[in-house]
Amino acid sequence: MEINYWYKLTFEIEANLEEIIIWKLNELGISSYALEILLNNKNNKKVLIWLPNLNWPKSLRIKLERNIKEVLDKNNYRTNCFEWIVIEQEDWMSSWKKYWGPELVGKKLLVLPCWLELPEKFKNKKVIKIDPGAAFGTGSHPTTSLCLEELEKFSLSNKKILDIGSGSGILSIAARYFGASKVYSIDNDYLAINSTESNFRLNFGDLDDLKTYLGRFDELVSKYSLKNFDLILCNILAEVIKGIIPDIRNCLKINGEVIFSGILNSQKDEIIKLLNASNLQINDVSSKQGWVCITAQKII
């Protein structure tokens, strides 16, 4: 069944609450959103969220509004100004495009919306073309850019890669651009799987070097005997990461590595402790805008 219309939710927040709101949206599985600076009040930002009608009945929309209010209340910001409107699929397809532009990530990559021409000054970059459809995911979010910046340090020639929580497929595409021979992508949202496959085909013309799986990682591991990976990319919420660290370790070959992102600064120490307990050696820790990326290795 296809999406035929969208709910658009708009509300304002103080600019310093941006990170916690993004974290909450990610926790709730919402990836189609944007934040807009207000010209008349630069201390505030407008949050725009797009929700496909098939996945968001009235009961879930009410719960979402309540969850957002709770986060704002805890941070001493109160608002009742939640605006809901219904937009048609065609209008949605154009409404969020104005928030997109070419996005430089790290030293080598440029993320380019597929409807834009490549600027001349970026001709020397590795270009990842993205058409997000219903699954947003660009290099602009700190969790993604941290992961991409770490990924470009690796020599991936002929390596076997697993991408957990693929979203729009940007990490899977980057891994293939950096030389991976085969990329395996997992997401529990069929919209994300469709987006990953579509964007991979947009960049490489076919899906010969991509294998996708729909479902939960911990269930798919045993069902499909996923193992012997050289590198695993895991850009998902820390609360989910905590429960799958042993399975991730089992999927790695000896000396294989894993890049974790989606971790808040406040969650870093707990994640590192769990990684150490699973005999995963910490090789690198980086941070950006309150988010942390951890690279660990299976030594024995």
From Swiss-Prot:
Keywords: Cytoplasm, Methyltransferase, S-adenosyl-L-methionine, Transferase
InterPro entries documented for this protein: Ribosomal_L11_MeTrfase_PrmA, Ribosomal_PrmA_MeTrfase, SAM-dependent_MTases_sf
Coiled-coil regions listed in the entry: none
Disulfide bonds: none
GO cellular component, one term: cytoplasm
GO terms under biological process: methylation
Primary localization class, coarse: cytoplasm
Pfam families: PrmA
Gene Ontology molecular function, alphabetical: protein-lysine N-methyltransferase activity
UniProt-annotated binding residues for S-adenosyl-L-methionine: T144, G165, D187, N235
Reactions accelerated catalytically: L-lysyl-[protein] + 3 S-adenosyl-L-methionine = N(6),N(6),N(6)-trimethyl-L-lysyl-[protein] + 3 S-adenosyl-L-homocysteine + 3 H(+)
HAMAP family registered for this protein in UniProt: Methyltr_PrmA
Function: Methylates ribosomal protein L11.
Name the UniProt record assigns to this protein: Ribosomal protein L11 methyltransferase
Originating species: Prochlorococcus marinus (strain MIT 9515)
Organism classification: Bacteria, Bacillati, Cyanobacteriota, Cyanophyceae, Synechococcales
